[in-house]
Amino acid sequence: MSITAQSVYRDTGNFFRNQFMTILLISLLCAFITVVLGHVFSPSDAQLAQLNDGVPVSGSSGLFDLVQNMSPEQQQILLQASAASTFSGLIGNAILAGGVILIIQLVSAGQRVSALRAIGASAPILPKLFILIFLTTLLVQIGIMLVVVPGIIMAILLALAPVMLVQDKMGVFASMRSSMRLTWANMRLVAPAVLSWLLAKTLLLLFASSFAALTPEIGAVLANTLSNLISAVLLIYLFRLYMLIRQ
């Protein structure tokens, strides 16, 4: 059977509309979890204020130069802030991926579903999803730091891994290998969706500062919720595409 991107887009749009409230609640809940965890593990405001003390920002030629000019205490604060942001984001993304994929599975099986039920049902696979998303994020970030293009290619090749991990109960590395092979064979169907997702995420990041006009916390929750909705659309598309490819 010939698969067209247009038909998968249409199926994705229909599912997203029909399950919008459930997906919105999961996106909001994951955003709240991300913001709360980030706040709990981040350095205090007083510690963050120390990052500006005695650091010649204008004279620094780059990020590494800026970090080298920091005191050991400032470097530790920066590391803690970065780790808190990364950890909270990974937790939120793992719960989002697990919840959205379980929604699709439950709805496809004709069962009634709620946001909490989907998240609860995904609990057993969350540790593997966390490791998978961590490794994927690491590889993509390394690729982007090198010349950008390798990072984008890795994001495309590993896009199907979360779906395969949950749907076929694969291991972390098996799902990554299988995703690379399957995506490479269906690049014309996967690449446009992932590139659109990356573009939407980038645009959201550019306008994220405007959300802080409310309060930093509410703005962060709103920005993360929108980001999660964008990721949910991609997950729905990838799940539908994967099921069609397997037929």
From Swiss-Prot:
Topological domains annotated Cytoplasmic: 1-19, 108-117, 173-186, 246-247
Q: Which InterPro entries match?
A: UPF0259
Residues on the membrane's Periplasmic side span 41-86, 141-151, 210-224
| Keywords assigned | Cell inner membrane, Cell membrane, Membrane, Transmembrane, Transmembrane helix
Record's bilayer topology term: Multi-pass membrane protein
One GO term of the cellular component aspect? plasma membrane
Which residue windows are transmembrane per the record? Answer: 20-40, 87-107, 118-140, 152-172, 187-209, 225-245
Quick check: keyword Zinc in the entry? Answer: no
Can you tell which superkingdom this protein's organism belongs to?
Bacteria
Q: Where in the cell is it found?
A: Cell inner membrane
Kindly name one Pfam family recorded for this protein.
UPF0259
The family classification in the record reads: Belongs to the UPF0259 family.
Instruction: Name it.
Output: UPF0259 membrane protein YciC
Biological source species: Escherichia coli O6:H1 (strain CFT073 / ATCC 700928 / UPEC)
Q: Which gene encodes it?
A: yciC
